[in-house]
């Protein structure tokens, strides 16, 4: 999900291809597909669907949980309201934003709410960054990742409400469902009862599950968690220096707890194993899930993210006078003599100027595009430790409806796979009563990112054979593959390893008029969709607070954001 830049004329052809391949949110270039010739029935079906009118859906899954009265939701709502109620600027700032993922979209949305005029530039021809998706020749969508919207995402939930699209979230029953590797084809559930408040509903879910953890293991795990419960956020942040495995050993938590629960959780949160993941990441998730009644409740988007989530944000931005441009890749950050930003130079030769600039693309791209005069500034130097993690998203269309699955997210507990879902069940736009489409996160992916798609599919099928022993075999003697798509993201969210927290930057940089947005920037939700949206709000807040300074700053003083050919 990340990309790189700082391109010179000499290496432009190579760099452009490299950038495209690593473009934020993964890229279509890296998403290859394969079709079995006998899929005419599938082609006929999808052609009919692709010629239909606009998607018409009404959410009829589990009713939307009552989130509006939670402390975190109200806090997020207050921050959103502060932009709408901010004094209208005498002359709106023209803010140029690079990157139309959730962080860039959020930044532009809230700046527009505050009365300013964002110009949002996206390098590719698709919105969404890490939630980008593409439609194939049959009209079927394939995505950068398997995206889950938690009740514990207050800023994301507010965003849906502000856009009037709450009905586009398909809420699932309040459960976490894990495959049982020792019992192929079987699952174990953690069911959270609605009648109990937090944290009792979470405690009840853990205590009632006797298939994954024994009572002595549960007790030792609970004792190990006591310092986090008592110490609060300060304790959580102090654990950044320990990996999950190190923390568990330090707290005397049995190793089997890590094996049974936290390998799956680590891979789901950051695509890496618990011997690498910072314990802070796990504790933040547990904190939200245990303190909020509906925190761990999950929802799927009812269709593809670019159309069902990103476009409503774009429509909102444009309705308030902002602009959004695709196919506008940053080649260079050009500086004034005093080291401030003069313009963004695009790969098409155009320059874009404004009153303020936001870099909302992933951290790996920023590091490649960072101007030489900035590289030794501590604020930017610390970014060296922040590196995107590779991940692979796999989509497989089968010739039949698989039975051993649920209308929910499933934790595979496989060595190669993380979470997966039968999207023909969980998502209205992808619904199919006759055939299953499994979307699977292949992680950790570092050793596989350079392998061929056929290698990845072969390995995936061997894992699926364990999850569907009666329905899938690796040699396809049972369910047959009609087609597949493999989307490789060489650099996704930043790798949340120990001691990263001090390296995460504030949204306001030391360069006057230059700001950052992205889940790697400082906010409490780490690498997530919620973190991206919140970072955009913090970035917008910084710009609104700096209005007088930006309005009075030298040659950029309230200039129109311009795009000029060079």
From Swiss-Prot:
Pfam families from the UniProt entry? Amino_oxidase
Q: Which GO terms describe its biological process?
A: carotenoid biosynthetic process
Main location as per UniProt = plastid
Catalytic activity, as annotated: 2 a plastoquinone + 15-cis-phytoene = 9,9',15-tri-cis-zeta-carotene + 2 a plastoquinol
The EC number of this protein is: 1.3.5.5
Residues that coordinate or bind substrate: 288, 527
Sorted alphabetically, the keyword list is: Carotenoid biosynthesis, Chloroplast, Chromoplast, FAD, Flavoprotein, Membrane, Oxidoreductase, Plastid, Transit peptide
Write down the SUPFAM superfamilies for this protein, in alphabetical order: FAD/NAD(P)-binding domain
Q: Does the keyword Membrane apply?
A: yes
Q: Binding of FAD: at which residues?
A: 103, 122-123, 130, 147-148, 153, 330, 519, 529
Task: State the oligomer form and interacting partners.
Answer: Homotetramer.
Q: Which PANTHER family match?
A: 15-CIS-PHYTOENE DESATURASE, CHLOROPLASTIC_CHROMOPLASTIC, PROTOPORPHYRINOGEN OXIDASE
**Protein name in the entry:** 15-cis-phytoene desaturase, chloroplastic/chromoplastic
Species of origin reads Arabidopsis thaliana
């Amino acid at each position: 999900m990340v990309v790189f830049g700082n391109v010179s004329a000499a290496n432009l052809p190579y760099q452009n291809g490299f950038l495209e391949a690593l473009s934020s949110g993964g890229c279509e270039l890296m998403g290859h597909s394969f079709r079995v010739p006998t899929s005419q029935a599938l082609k006929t079906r999808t052609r009919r669907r692709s010629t239909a009118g606009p998607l018409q859906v009404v959410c009829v899954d589990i009713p939307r949980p009552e989130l509006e009265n939670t402390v975190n939701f109200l806090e997020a709502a207050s921050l959103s309201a502060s932009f709408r109620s901010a004094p209208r600027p005498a002359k709106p700032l023209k803010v140029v934003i690079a990157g139309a993922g959730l962080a860039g979209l959020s930044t532009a949305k809230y700046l527009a709410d505050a009365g300013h005029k964002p110009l949002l530039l996206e390098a590719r021809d698709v919105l969404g960054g890490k939630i980008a998706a593409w439609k194939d020749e049959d009209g079927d969508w394939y995505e950068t990742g398997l995206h889950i919207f938690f009740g514990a995402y207050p800023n994301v939930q507010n965003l849906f409400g502000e856009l009037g699209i709450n009905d586009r979230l398909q809420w699932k029953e309040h459960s976490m469902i894990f495959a049982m590797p020792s019992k192929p084809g079987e699952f174990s559930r953690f069911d959270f009862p609605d009648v109990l408040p937090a944290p009792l509903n979470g405690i009840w879910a853990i205590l009632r599950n006797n298939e994954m953890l024994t009572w002595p293991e549960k007790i030792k795990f609970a004792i190990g968690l006591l310092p986090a419960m008592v110490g609060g956020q300060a304790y959580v942040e102090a654990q950044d220096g320990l990996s999950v495995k190190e923390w568990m050993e330090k707290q005397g938590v049995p190793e089997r707890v890590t094996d049974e629960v936290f390998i799956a959780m680590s891979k789901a949160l950051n695509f890496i194993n618990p011997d690498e993941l910072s314990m802070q990441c796990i504790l933040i998730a547990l904190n939200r899930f245990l303190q909020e009644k509906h925190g761990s409740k999950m929802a799927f988007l009812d269709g593809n993210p670019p159309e069902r989530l990103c476009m409503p944000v774009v429509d909102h931005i444009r309705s308030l006078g902002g602009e959004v441009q695709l196919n506008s890749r940053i080649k260079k950050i050009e500086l004034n003599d005093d080291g401030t930003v003069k313009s963004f130079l695009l790969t098409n030769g155009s320059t874009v100027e404004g009153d303020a600039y936001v870099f909302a693309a992933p951290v790996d791209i920023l590091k490649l595009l960072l101007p030489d005069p900035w590289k030794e500034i501590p604020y930017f130097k610390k970014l060296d430790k922040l590196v995107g993690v590779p991940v692979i998203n796999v989509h497989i269309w089968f010739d039949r409806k698989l039975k051993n699955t649920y209308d929910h997210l499933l934790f595979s507990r496989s060595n190669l796979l993380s979470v997966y879902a039968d999207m023909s069940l969980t998502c209205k736009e992808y619904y199919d009563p006759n055939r299953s489409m499994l979307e699977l996160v292949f992680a950790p992916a570092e050793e596989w990112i350079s392998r061929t798609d056929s290698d990845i599919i072969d390995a995936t099928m061997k894992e699926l054979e364990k999850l569907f022993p009666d329905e899938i075999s690796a040699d396809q003697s049972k369910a047959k593959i009609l087609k597949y798509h493999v989307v490789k993201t060489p650099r996704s969210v930043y790798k949340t390893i120990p001691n990263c927290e001090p390296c995460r930057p504030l949204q306001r940089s030391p360069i006057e008029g230059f700001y950052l947005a992205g889940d790697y920037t400082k906010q409490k939700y780490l690498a997530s969709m919620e973190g991206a949206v919140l970072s955009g709000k913090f970035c917008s807040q910084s710009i609104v607070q700096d209005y007088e300074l930006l309005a009075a700053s030298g040659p950029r003083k309230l200039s129109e954001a311009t795009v000029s050919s060079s």
